[in-house]
Each structure stands twice: as structure tokens, then as C-alpha cells.
């Protein structure tokens, strides 16, 4: 017996025409880790048994859940997952986002079929397929001197038995691009005091030209499983509110962020991740700070300002949204 190696794992993804029905191109996801699993719920019988044994255990619901972790880069499948997170019309996993096209958070739910292959590198390949996988959460993290990393969480409506043969075949290879780092000047945070713009030119340096050492962006679609009588499979997956939160650490060189917190003053933030070759911009035109701390942690340390924030609904022109995503904006 040869033991399977995590280094030989491959994850394929395809869009779906309906919840649980794969359709279109199949692409390879580039990941650093994954935790995609079946989640089976059971109930135990309450029958009184004089032998003190539990008489039975029955399955009552079945779904999939888990996360994929990745190093953020210019990558077509990742683009389409981002579209799904935003509730925008789902694109092709082989094409990705269209350059210089706005993606606003909306109400269209997209789903994917994901197949995980594990292998011993010799004769045994095992395949787990999860259907109706709806993007639930996103966490992007950037810290000085590191890659920009991401985690996407899924909720799925369909779990299949493990097999030794594949049901998906990649039609498009993984895009070979270099992960974005925080060393590149195109990965940055910009500030707009007016709190009503998605025009790049309106965003400038942080107040007092403060320098950020880290930032994060979190998106939560508030998904919920919709169970049903007559089947252990989910009837569907419900969407809740589109919630955007984040954090930022800056050197404590200016009073603006602190006073914005005290006065609940709204402002705009632009989180840009990229390189000289490509970039992604996340516009948050109305942000409210929910926590600010300025602490002297100890000797031989810099004084830092730790900021937590939440983005709220904004109206810019005819668009009503919380976050706008644009790739390679002109």
C-alpha cells in the first residue's frame, strides 16, 4: 500500500447551469491548502432500550462545505469565484474577468462543481466531487514582506460517493502567473475623504501619508442551507446580506482615522492588489470604522494604529452597492 501525498492533489472547477449541474469549461484551481468535505447530519433514536444501547442513527441532511486557500494572482478561475462572491453574473472559468469592466455586488447566485483528486503517484487515484458549491466567504490578507493570500469558503448542496475515476477533465490549464506580493508598489491602500466616489483619481495617500503594514478584506454572503422533507439533499442555498469588513494596521503618524472612529465619519477606501503587469481594485466608497486602537506595546517597538472597519451601502450615480471590483482598470 502506498500512502497518498497531499503534494499530488489536484482540484478542478466548472461553472454550473443549475445547482449541482456542471456546465462549460473545466479549469484547474491553484491552491495552497483546502478543507473541502462532506457534512452529513444524523439523528439518534430516543427509543428506550433495556440493554442501554442506542438503537439506531439516521442521516437527515447532506451538504458540502469547506475552504480553499490560495496565493492571490492573475488567475481566470479565481476571477470567476470572485464574481460568484459578488453575486454578479458568472463568467467562464477559462476566461475570467474582463479588463476594465466594473463588477458590483448584486443578487445573482452562482454555483460550481468542484472535484478533488488525491493520489499516491502510482496506481491509486481517489476522487471526491462536490456539486452546487456556492461561494460563501472571502478573506484577503496582505502583510508587509509576504504574498497576498486568500481564502474562499463554500457551501454545497450535493455530495457524491468517492470514486476511483474522474468525472471532470480539465479543458484549461492553470494560469501560470506569479503571486502578488506586498513589496510591489501596485499593492496598496488609498483614501478618499469624500466617501462617495469610485473614480481612481479621487483616491490618494492615507492621511498624513501614513504607511500601512497590513490590511485585510472579508466578504460574507450569509449563506444558509435550505433543508427539505423527502430528501437528505438540500433544496437550495439561501443568500443573506452582503457584508464587507476589514482591518488595517498603519503607523500612528496622523489623527484622522482615530477621529473618524470617534465621530463615526464615513470615508472611502481603495484596496489594490497587483503588480506592474495586472491589478485588482476593490472600491469601498463608504466605510465606517468600528474599532481603533493606538497602543505602546513595549520597548523597542513602533506605535501602531490598529483599525477595523465595515463598508456600507453607497449610491454613486445610478449604482447602489457596497463594493466594486475592477481588474486592470484603464
Model-derived segments and spans:
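Signature of extracytoplasmic/envelope-associated structural regions
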Residues: 1-330
Amino acid at each position: 500500500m502506498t500512502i497518498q501525498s497531499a503534494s499530488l492533489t489536484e482540484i478542478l472547477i466548472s461553472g454550473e447551469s443549475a445547482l449541482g449541474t456542471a456546465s462549460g469549461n473545466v479549469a484547474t484551481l491553484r491552491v495552497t491548502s483546502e478543507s473541502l468535505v462532506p457534512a452529513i447530519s444524523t439523528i439518534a433514536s430516543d427509543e428506550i432500550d433495556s440493554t442501554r444501547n442506542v438503537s439506531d442513527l439516521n442521516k437527515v441532511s447532506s451538504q458540502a462545505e469547506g475552504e480553499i486557500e490560495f496565493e492571490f494572482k492573475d488567475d481566470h478561475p479565481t476571477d470567476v469565484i470572485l464574481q460568484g462572491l459578488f453575486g454578479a453574473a458568472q463568467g467562464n472559468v477559462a476566461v475570467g474577468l474582463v479588463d476594465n469592466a466594473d463588477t458590483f455586488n448584486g443578487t445573482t447566485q452562482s454555483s460550481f462543481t468542484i472535484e478533488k483528486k488525491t493520489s499516491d503517484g502510482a496506481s491509486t487515484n481517489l476522487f471526491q466531487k462536490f456539486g452546487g458549491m456556492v461561494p460563501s466567504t472571502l478573506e484577503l490578507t496582505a502583510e508587509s514582506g509576504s504574498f497576498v493570500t486568500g481564502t474562499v469558503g463554500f457551501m454545497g448542496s450535493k455530495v457524491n460517493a468517492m470514486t476511483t475515476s474522474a468525472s471532470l477533465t480539465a479543458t484549461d490549464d492553470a494560469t501560470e502567473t506569479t503571486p502578488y506580493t506586498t513589496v510591489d508598489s501596485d499593492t496598496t491602500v488609498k483614501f478618499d475623504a469624500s466617501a462617495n466616489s469610485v473614480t481612481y483619481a479621487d483616491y490618494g495617500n492615507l492621511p498624513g501619508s501614513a504607511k500601512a503594514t497590513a490590511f485585510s478584506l472579508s466578504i460574507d454572503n450569509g449563506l444558509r442551507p435550505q433543508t427539505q422533507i423527502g430528501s437528505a439533499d438540500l433544496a437550495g442555498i439561501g443568500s443573506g446580506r452582503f457584508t464587507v469588513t476589514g482591518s488595517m494596521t498603519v503607523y500612528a503618524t496622523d489623527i484622522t482615522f482615530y477621529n473618524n472612529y470617534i465621530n463615526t465619519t464615513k470615508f472611502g477606501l481603495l484596496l489594490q492588489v497587483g503588480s506592474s503587469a495586472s491589478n485588482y481594485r476593490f472600491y469601498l466608497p463608504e466605510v465606517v470604522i468600528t474599532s481603533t486602537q493606538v497602543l505602546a506595546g513595549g520597548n523597542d517597538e513602533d506605535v501602531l494604529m490598529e483599525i477595523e472597519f465595515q463598508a456600507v451601502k453607497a449610491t454613486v450615480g445610478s449604482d447602489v452597492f457596497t463594493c466594486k471590483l475592477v481588474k486592470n482598470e484603464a
